[in-house]
Each structure stands twice: as structure tokens, then as C-alpha cells.
Amino acid sequence: MRAPAIGALFFVIFVPLIIIMGDYWDHRPQKETAVLVGVITQNQTEEMAREYLEELAFLVDTAGAEQRAIFTQRLDVPHPKTFIGSGKLIEVREYVKEEEIDMVIFDDELTPSQLRNIERELNCRILDRTNLILDIFAGRAQTAHAKTQVELAQYQYLLPRLTRMWTHLERQRGGIGLRGPGETEIETDRRIIRDRIAKLKLQMTKIDKQMMVQRKNRGKMVRVALVGYTNAGKSTLMNLLSKSKVFAEDKLFATLDTTVRKVVVENLPFLLSDTVGFIRKLPTHLVESFKSTLDEVREADVLIHVVDISHPNYEEQIGVVETTLRELGGADIPCMLVFNKTDAYSYIKKDDDDLTPSTKENLSLDDHIEDWNRSHPGSLFISALKKSNIDELKDQLYQKVKEIHVKRYPYNDLLY
């Protein structure tokens, strides 16, 4: 082919492509921008506030937004009218206006009156932690069951907040905090919302009964449930033990629908459930709405509490899970404590001549293993991703399941 022909071909094929791609990059969807707000109080130390806001930032990322700034204020208690003081509110308002921020997210559940007052002052979309979690759940729900549960929780949250300054246009445009229960306008009659809640509760009653029948129909096989803080690696472990493909991702609430698989270890079968992860300040509406999902935990014979050992605040996360289990009525269920993500663990090693007191940041993985096996004998340390120490986990799990079979069922009634 002659050179002029090649040049002509370039202009015919590549120039239009370059123009198209340039137009795409100029008009590609932009992430919504968010400012985070938290308070330091008598009941929430500066360190706790920082940890909670880090988690809120992870939630924001999971929801698909971009965090631009964090504002904190030290108060005895949150301001009853605006959550934060007037001076801090002005500071946030100026930043929002100057940077053209889409939304401000508070790391606590705001009262309806606080929400209205803050919206009036900041003149932008206001979300709280509960609203954000509900929005993530709405985006994650796949089955009709999960969608019904989330929609019910959203409407229960929305009912006392119908006077929020959301316009019909905003709901049509969509965005974080605006997903879910349809094109509800500000002027929507409360009665319509209550009627919808009543219908959803009726649907959930039917779903709960169906789920209960399904659990009964599983026969006498032992039930094992994976529990833990969100993003601890439960789904990755589920995939490893069941040799199935359960959606696993480095995001909060990657699993929403409960997944149940039949697993066989050394010819002994049992049912393994992967459940929704727990989190600090889990909205009450979600706990109520996800009754049938959480029944998988309540009715389990054995719990595997999966902990992310690489998280700097894993001990507090353990406390959140244990508190939630108590509230669900599952505190007395035999539980295996499994520390996951050993491959991601890191620490700051002190020099031999460093005489300063050691902190938890200086503890090696071996130090943690020694401490936990002293206080909780039988604790396991694994990496589901790297498949390390999985055989020991299977051995312990086999012994637990076998013990329940032998104790509760005749030998000839075992399922093989």
C-alpha cells in the first residue's frame, strides 16, 4: 500500500475514534462528591471518632462517591438542633459552596428535625450513616427477597422524614441516598407510605414463612453459619470451603443475600451459610427487616466468627459482632473464632535498643496468636485468599460437626 493511502486510512479510522474517545472523557460520568462530618463527645473519644470516620469513608467509597473533606467538632453531646455547632456548620457550608460539593454525610443517625435544620443551613443533600448504609443495601440487593427487605427498611426510615428538601427532579436524576423506594416526592401523603409499609410487611411475613419451611426441609444436617464484621473475608472462605462461586469483593456489604451450600468434610455433610456482615451502628430498621436472613444465624448449630486480623481495630470489630449476636439471641451457640487475612497483617518492628513502651502496632502476628490462644484456646489464624492453615480449620470444623451429630442423632441417621 502506498504511503498516501496509509495516511488516508489513518484519518478515516483513527481520527474519528480519537474524537469519540475525547468526547467520552469530557462527558464521562463523574463521581458524586461528599464531605464527612463527625463529633468527639464524652462517649466517643477522638480516636473512636477517627476510626468511625475512616469506616464511613469506606462506606462512601463502596457507595461510589468521592470523599473530599472531613470535619470534626468536640462537643459534650451532639447539638440537638443541628448535630454540630453553628460555627462549624458555617465552616462546612462555606466549603460545600466553594467546592460545589454534592452531599454532606454525618456519621450518626440524624433525627428528622436535625435533618431538616441542616438541609436548610447547608442547602445541599444531607445523608446520615443509616441513609448511606440503606443506599448501599439498595444497590447490592439482587433477589426479590433482599429487595423487599431493603425497601421496607427504607420506607420505615423515610416515613418521619417526608419533609426533607428532596425535589422530584433530584429523585429522577438519582444519586447516592436517592436510590430505592421509587419516585417519592416531598408532598407524598404519609398514608400512602404507611400503606406501602403494611404491604411490604405482609410480603415479608410470607417470605419469612417460606424461608422457615426451606430451613425445615433441609433435614437433619448440621447448620454452620459464617458471621463477622463486614469485609472480614467470609465470602472468600465460603468459596474455599464449599468450592462454589459466591460473590466476594473488597467492599463493605459485598454479600447481602444469605447463601447456603452443602459442604462435605471427610464424608460428613453439613450446611454452610454466608450471612450479611455486621457493622457499628447497624440501623435498627435493617435488623428488623432482615429477620429471615438473620434467622440463619439464630438457628445455626455452629458459628464461624471470621475476623480480619489485618484491620487495626479488629478487637473492637469482634466486640461489635459479639454484641450483635447477643441481641439476635445467638450468644450461646458454639462459636469458632477464625482470624483471617494473616497474609495482609503488618506491624512496626521495634529496634532491640528501643526502650519505649510497646503498643499494639508493635505486636507481631506470633504475638497475637500467643495472646489469643491463651485467652481463647483453639483460635485459628488463616488466610482464605492464600489458602493457608485451611486444613486445620477443616479438622476443627469436622470435630465440631461430628460432635453434634453423635450427641443429637442416632448413628444410622447420619447423612452421607
What role is predicted for each listed range?
Residues 13-129, 133:
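N-terminal accessory targeting/assembly segments
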